[in-house]
């Protein structure tokens, strides 16, 4: 069971009689609740920055008394700083930079392969009647193309090649495995 601050999270409206027009079902599904599952004051983005905490620790060291909360804060801050250092060290290692470079090459190659197909799609659609709306293939922010179900069937071979190439690079990764 999850616990939230009572003042931060609203109680769900469970009876459908409170909703106009929906009298057929007695209860609402969980995705229809008018609730927040994370307390807004406890969300990660509201946590203080490390610089702010370090300034607080410096101010705490000037006090003539020792506070257990200050010592706990210092311990947590040291852990965070050491974790950041280890993460930077791993990300700067030759193995990770080589793999990131290889992934960038693969992304560029995939984008280069998709560009001629897009130009063909534009030119073939342009010759059709004025009443026909051309199907334009969009691009996502990261540059990946949005494909239609028809194109997925034609590109299965290249997708399998890329998957095999990426899976061959997986054994080179070192460190603990995180399950998402």
UniProtKB/Swiss-Prot annotation:
The modification Phosphoserine is found at residue 148. GO terms for biological process: negative regulation of DNA-templated transcription; rhythmic process. Its cofactor is Fe(2+). InterPro entries: Znf_RING/FYVE/PHD (IPR013083). One of its GO terms (molecular function) is metal ion binding. Its EC number is 1.14.11.67. It is an enzyme of class 1 (oxidoreductase). Residues 116-159 are annotated as: Disordered. It comes from the Eukaryota. Its main location: nucleus. It is found in: Nucleus. It catalyses: N(6),N(6),N(6)-trimethyl-L-lysyl(4)-[histone H3] + 3 2-oxoglutarate + 3 O2 = L-lysyl(4)-[histone H3] + 3 formaldehyde + 3 succinate + 3 CO2. The keyword Translocase does not apply. One of its GO terms (cellular component) is nucleus. Keywords: Biological rhythms, Chromatin regulator, Dioxygenase, Iron, Metal-binding, Nucleus, Oxidoreductase, Phosphoprotein, Repeat, Repressor, Transcription, Transcription regulation. Binds 1 Fe(2+) ion per subunit. Histone demethylase that specifically demethylates 'Lys-4' of histone H3, thereby playing a central role in histone code. Does not demethylate histone H3 'Lys-9', H3 'Lys-27', H3 'Lys-36', H3 'Lys-79' or H4 'Lys-20'. Demethylates trimethylated and dimethylated but not monomethylated H3 'Lys-4'. Participates in transcriptional repression of neuronal genes by recruiting histone deacetylases and REST at neuron-restrictive silencer elements. Represses the CLOCK-BMAL1 heterodimer-mediated transcriptional activation of the core clock component PER2. Part of two distinct complexes, one containing E2F6, and the other containing REST. Interacts with ZMYND8. Belongs to the JARID1 histone demethylase family. This is Lysine-specific demethylase 5C. It comes from Cricetulus griseus. The gene is KDM5C.
């Amino acid at each position: 069971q999850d616990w939230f601050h009572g003042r931060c999270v609203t109680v769900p409206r469970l009876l459908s009689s409170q909703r106009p027009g929906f009298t057929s079902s007695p209860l609402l599904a969980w995705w229809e609740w008018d609730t927040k599952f994370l307390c807004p004051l406890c969300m990660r983005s509201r946590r203080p920055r490390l610089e702010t905490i370090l300034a607080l620790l410096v101010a705490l060291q000037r006090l003539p008394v020792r506070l257990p909360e200050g010592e706990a804060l210092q311990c947590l801050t040291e852990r965070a700083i050491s974790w950041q250092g280890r993460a930077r060290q791993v990300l700067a290692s030759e193995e990770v930079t080589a793999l990131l470079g290889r992934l960038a090459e693969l992304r560029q190659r995939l984008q280069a392969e998709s560009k001629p197909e897009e130009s063909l799609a534009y030119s073939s659609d342009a010759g059709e009647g004025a009443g026909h709306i051309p199907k334009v293939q969009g691009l996502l922010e990261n540059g990946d193309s949005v494909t239609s179900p028809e194109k997925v069937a034609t590109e299965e071979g290249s997708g399998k090649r890329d998957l095999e190439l990426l899976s061959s690079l997986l054994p080179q990764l070192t460190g603990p495995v995180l399950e998402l």
